[in-house]
């Protein structure tokens, strides 16, 4: 586990004041009309860089009035901005069977958020800014994206209520709460600020032989939480068209939700071999999806047993695809292949990702995925060595409008 030595102080640059000055709950919240030109397709190969991003939009109109927990239900057109996400099923392509689809969320439905900030008071490796990160993020979600306070669970180790402490049991319970009863076009949000690390991977599913883990406040007694478990609880149960946005402010968070597609400002860093997964029987085609039958949606992958030798005893484990028909994306500030030395440096950057995300979104709430990735990179570069990564459960058209 890499200890973060100290939290950089944000000084006046952190938009703390701006939170309270905002009268308007939905500044520039809108979906632009479709682009007049066809989307550029520069993403088929890992080697390719991104196409030039479109010009920034001229800003949407302002919003007044709000419904609790739902975003505004009308969107003013913004001319020349990125295209809103398509509403119909999208094919995975790249070797996946015909009919193996995913669906973007319009983020017009219910909104729930889980935010976890751990300073590890009185423990070796105590951190300074994690609870503050969560306060800033929850305020931003509440004021700008219509997440009602009563639809947020906030676990921090400065709270008196034992149920609000970020213990392993409370975190796992809250993860189940977050995804329970989610429907298409809902927008779920997960934020973790605290220690992250790596542990040897037992089921052979990580490229580098390590699983990424997060450390609950009681990890010395209860242990850590592995990326496989977070994926199983928060990604696996989601139907097509449900958005889960995750932001990790921690070391080694590059693949903390075990999402198979990873993008950087340079282009696609990683994508799954879907032809191989299909050959192993991992990609069950969801015919019920084509019929619009949401009930048959839950099992998206046929389990496939794989032998692995551990010492002398051979044991069986289930290998499953990490793709999902849901709309799961994650912003993180570290790479899977970071050496521990890099991680020591990045370790001082706890809070970097959420700070850069909020700062970039405040400057322009109407960006495409690739524009936002570049904006976040620009914000990070003013204070930190880390670079942002955007991971997804499905192939992303990064020229689409980022909605939440």
UniProtKB/Swiss-Prot annotation:
Disulfide bonds: none annotated. The active site is at 195, 251. Keywords: Apoptosis, Hydrolase, Protease, Thiol protease, Zymogen. It comes from the Eukaryota. Gene3D superfamilies: 3.40.50.12660. Pfam families: Peptidase_C14. One of its GO terms (biological process) is proteolysis. Involved in cell death (apoptosis). Belongs to the peptidase C14B family. This is Metacaspase-1. It comes from Emericella nidulans (strain FGSC A4 / ATCC 38163 / CBS 112.46 / NRRL 194 / M139) (Aspergillus nidulans). The lineage of its organism: Eukaryota, Fungi, Dikarya, Ascomycota, Pezizomycotina.
């Amino acid at each position: 586990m890499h200890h973060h030595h100290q939290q950089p102080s944000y000084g006046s640059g952190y938009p703390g004041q701006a939170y309270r000055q905002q009268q308007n709950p939905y500044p520039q919240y809108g979906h632009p009309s479709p682009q007049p030109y066809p989307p550029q397709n520069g993403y088929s190969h890992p080697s390719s860089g991104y196409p030039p991003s479109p010009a920034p939009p001229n800003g949407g109109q302002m919003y007044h009035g709000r419904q609790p927990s739902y975003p505004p239900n009308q969107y003013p057109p913004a001319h020349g901005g990125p295209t809103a996400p398509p509403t119909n099923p999208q094919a995975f392509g790249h070797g996946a069977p015909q009919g193996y689809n995913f669906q973007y969320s319009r983020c017009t439905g219910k909104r729930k958020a889980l935010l976890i900030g751990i300073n590890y008071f009185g423990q070796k490796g105590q951190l300074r800014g994690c609870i503050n990160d969560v306060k800033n993020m929850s305020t931003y979600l509440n004021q700008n994206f219509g997440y009602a306070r009563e639809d947020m669970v906030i676990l921090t180790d400065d709270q008196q209520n034992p149920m609000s402490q970020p213990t392993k049991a409370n975190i796992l319970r809250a993860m189940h709460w977050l995804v329970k009863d989610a429907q298409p076009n809902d927008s779920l949000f997960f934020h973790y600020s605290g220690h992250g690390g790596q542990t040897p991977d037992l089921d052979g599913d990580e490229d580098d032989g390590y699983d990424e883990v997060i450390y609950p406040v009681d990890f010395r007694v209860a242990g850590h939480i592995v990326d496989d478990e977070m994926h199983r609880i928060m990604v696996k149960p989601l139907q097509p068209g449900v958005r889960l946005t995750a932001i990790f402010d921690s070391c080694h968070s590059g693949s903390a939700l075990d999402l198979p597609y990873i993008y950087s400002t340079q282009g696609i860093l990683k994508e799954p071999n879907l032809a191989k997964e299909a050959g192993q029987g991992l990609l069950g085609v969801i015919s019920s999806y084509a019929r619009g039958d949401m009930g048959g949606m839950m099992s998206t992958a046929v389990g496939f047993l794989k032998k692995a030798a551990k010492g002398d005893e051979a044991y069986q484990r289930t290998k499953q695809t990490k793709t999902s028909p849901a709309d799961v994306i994650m912003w993180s500030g570290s790479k899977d292949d970071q050496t521990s030395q890099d991680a020591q440096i990045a370790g001082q950057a706890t809070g970097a990702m959420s700070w850069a995300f909020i700062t970039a979104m405040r400057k322009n709430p109407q960006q495409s995925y690739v524009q936002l990735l570049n904006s976040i990179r620009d914000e990070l570069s003013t204070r930190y060595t880390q670079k942002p990564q955007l991971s997804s459960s499905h192939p992303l058209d990064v020229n689409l409008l980022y909605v939440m």
